[in-house]
Amino acid sequence: MSSQDVLIHSDDPCHPANLICTLCKQFFHNNWCTGTGGGISIKDPNTNYYYLAPSGVQKEKMTPEDLFVMDAQTLEYLRSPKLYKPSACTPLFLACYQKKDAGAIIHTHSQNAVICSLVFGDEFRIANIEQIKAIPSGKVDPVTKKPMTLSFFDTLKIPIIENMAHEDELIDDLHKTFKDYPDTCAVIVRRHGIFVWGPTIDKAKIFNEAIDYLMELAIKMYQMGIPPDCGIGEEKKHLKMASP
């Protein structure tokens, strides 16, 4: 086995090389990463290597042999599959690693994200929904010193940026959202999809699932005439009356 192949072969199902393939299959079946769209990257906390899904590979068929591996310090590729090129998302993934101290980043072409980008302006907003409690607030508990999540009564805000012809051209707007929304764990790209990051792949996955649930709920609320961030008890004021 070559030194490059050692990086991607492990019997541990939670090894980044195995986990990326498992999650890509799941995301494909969730209709989030079809037609080779989307991507994922995981930082191995044991080696500080970045594992990156390649460009142009059907996500449900991805294998560890398809993955790129990069040194987090030098940003040099330690492993590059001959048949593929790096994901166009790579500069955006690196920005999340370097500026947000992410441990993993998920990029999907979720239809819910795309539709929300058409309905909302510069930011997605939803409030007073239980699932919001799965999203980090960016604050730290003064007693336990542990990260706090949003509360039921908080408003989740996710910035929306404009799409570009090429994904690497999104980098300036992504850096701007880091400054304007320092506590966000996601950014929606209009007519394109969403990027979600977290301190670990488990957290990033939870955030991504919760946000997609909330976006789907917001779309249904919008169809009913209910603003997704309306106050508790105000829902019926906005309900569209059914036709007789």
UniProtKB/Swiss-Prot annotation:
Cofactor details (free text): Binds 1 zinc ion per subunit.
E.C. numbers: 4.2.1.109
UniProt-annotated binding residues for substrate: C89
GO molecular function: methylthioribulose 1-phosphate dehydratase activity; zinc ion binding
Keywords of the record: Amino-acid biosynthesis, Cytoplasm, Lyase, Metal-binding, Methionine biosynthesis, Zinc
Pfam families with a match to the protein in the record: Aldolase_II
Cofactor: Zn(2+)
Single biological process term from Gene Ontology: L-methionine salvage from methylthioadenosine
Positions bound to Zn(2+): H107, H109, H192
Top-level enzyme category: lyase
GO cellular component labels: cytoplasm
CDD domains per the UniProt record, alphabetical: Aldolase_II (cd00398)
Active site: E130 (proton donor/acceptor)
Catalytically driven reaction(s): 5-(methylsulfanyl)-D-ribulose 1-phosphate = 5-methylsulfanyl-2,3-dioxopentyl phosphate + H2O
Location in the cell: Cytoplasm
Listed pathway(s): Amino-acid biosynthesis; L-methionine biosynthesis via salvage pathway; L-methionine from S-methyl-5-thio-alpha-D-ribose 1-phosphate: step 2/6
SUPFAM superfamilies linked to this entry: AraD/HMP-PK domain-like (SSF53639)
UniProt xrefs under NCBIfam families: salvage_mtnB
Function statement: Catalyzes the dehydration of methylthioribulose-1-phosphate (MTRu-1-P) into 2,3-diketo-5-methylthiopentyl-1-phosphate (DK-MTP-1-P).
Similarity annotation: Belongs to the aldolase class II family. MtnB subfamily.
Protein name: Methylthioribulose-1-phosphate dehydratase
Gene field: MDE1
